């Protein structure tokens, strides 16, 4: 492997933490205004959902999404694998199955060897193949210093089984299929302040596909779903609740966390994107007795996070068992994190 320099030293932010903040994004979309769409557009940007869905036939929809970001780890293959899993996750979050992917890359050819880019692409292809899909092309530009990589992900979904973020209802339980904390850990990686075992666990979490959780979600006919990425757990929950005209209570002690993340938050090893999320959440969140570091963890900008699912099925059902098994961590990790209310 050709790697003379740390990839994270070329990035201003880590992974999905470099996303435009939710408040800023809302402002831009408000300035843009609504647009007329064909009637076959079943899901678009209007509810801030994870992907668009276009009806192909009476029973089949095309799922389309795009994600890209700066390096969040130093190994180029891992970066490619994480970016691919992150892009495919939006298809899974809609209840779909990925079929095709396109590479989107920006590369500082005067700063980083092309062999590194090849490793990024190879890592991404590995994950796409694992998902049963294929990489069929892409587009690459040159950049001055900061590398960028991501993918367009395309899949199919049964139109009567689309999982939206706008259909949560009071009384539904909230499930989470992965632990949180990847934003804090990748920020620590960038700053050289985390150990190898914790970094490896975070990478393993981010490269784990949401395929099994998605299949369980679809089989259970859940009420609503989304994936947890750059706006953090509570940020994506806020988007779901606003789209569904609901509220929720979250048991913070039941949220599964990756190791060391609360300590990292206490030491202020926190990405700017997470701080923007936290500020945005102040408008609507009653934190109770949670300390500022505990609040930061719940706002932490995730990359390739888990599925956040609202379902009226109780924790004793197969949905809990099947999604619970997807969560990395010790046996018995608690994945029911709260409940939707009016």
Predicted regions: what is each one?
Residues 1-93, 133, 169-174, 320-321, ...:
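N-terminal glycine-rich phosphate/pyrophosphate-binding loops that anchor nucleotide-derived ligands
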Residues 41-43, 51-54, 89-93, 125, ...:
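A generic local secondary-structure boundary/capping motif
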Residues 56-73, 78-81, 97-194, 325, ...:
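Glycine-rich anion-binding loops of enzyme active sites
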Residues 152-161, 197-217, 290:
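Active-site glycine-rich loop that binds ribose-phosphate moieties when present
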Residues 17-18, 166, 177, 202, ...:
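Glycine- and other small-residue-rich loops at beta-strand/loop junctions that grip anionic moieties
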Residues 2-13, 24-27, 34, 39, ...:
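Glycine-/charge-enriched secondary-structure boundary and capping motifs
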Residues 52-63, 207-213, 278-288:
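Acidic-glycine-rich active-site phosphate/pyrophosphate-binding loop
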Residues 76-102, 119-130, 209-221, 233-239:
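Small-aliphatic-rich amphipathic alpha-helix that forms the alpha element of a beta-alpha
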């Amino acid at each position: 492997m050709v790697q003379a320099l740390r990839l994270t030293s070329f990035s201003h932010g880590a992974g999905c933490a470099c996303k435009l903040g939710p408040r800023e994004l809302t402002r831009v979309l408000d300035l843009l205004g609504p647009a007329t769409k064909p009637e076959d557009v079943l899901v678009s940007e209007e509810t801030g959902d994870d992907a668009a869905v276009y009806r192909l036939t009476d029973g089949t929809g095309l799922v389309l999404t795009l994600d890209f970001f700066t390096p969040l780890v130093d190994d180029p293959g891992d970066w490619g694998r994480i970016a691919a899993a992150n892009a495919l996750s939006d298809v899974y979050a809609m209840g779909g199955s990925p079929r095709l992917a396109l590479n989107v890359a920006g590369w500082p050819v005067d700063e980083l060897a092309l062999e590194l880019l090849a490793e990024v692409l190879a890592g991404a292809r590995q994950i796409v193949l694992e998902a049963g899909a294929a990489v069929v092309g892409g587009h690459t530009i040159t950049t001055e210093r900061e590398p960028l990589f991501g993918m367009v992900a395309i899949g199919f979904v049964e139109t009567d089984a689309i999982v939206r973020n706008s259909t949560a209802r009071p009384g539904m339980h909230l499930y989470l299929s992965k632990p949180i904390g990847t934003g804090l850990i990748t920020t620590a990686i960038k700053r050289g302040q985390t150990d190898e075992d914790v970094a490896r666990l975070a990478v393993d979490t981010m490269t784990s596909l949401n395929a099994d959780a998605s299949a369980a979600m679809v089989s259970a006919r859940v009420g609503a779903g989304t994936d947890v990425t750059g706006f953090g757990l509570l940020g994506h929950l806020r988007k779901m609740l606003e789209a569904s005209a609901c509220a929720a209570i979250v048991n913070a002690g039941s949220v599964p966390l990756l190791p060391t993340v609360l300590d990292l938050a206490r030491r202020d090893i926190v990405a700017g994107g997470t701080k923007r999320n936290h500020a945005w959440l102040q408008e609507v969140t009653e934190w109770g007795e949670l300390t500022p570091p505990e609040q930061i963890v719940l706002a932490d900008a995730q990359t390739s996070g888990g599925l956040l699912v609202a379902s009226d099925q109780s924790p004793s059902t197969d949905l809990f068992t099947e999604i619970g098994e997807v969560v990395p961590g010790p046996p018995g990790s608690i994945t029911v994190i709260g409940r939707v209310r009016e």
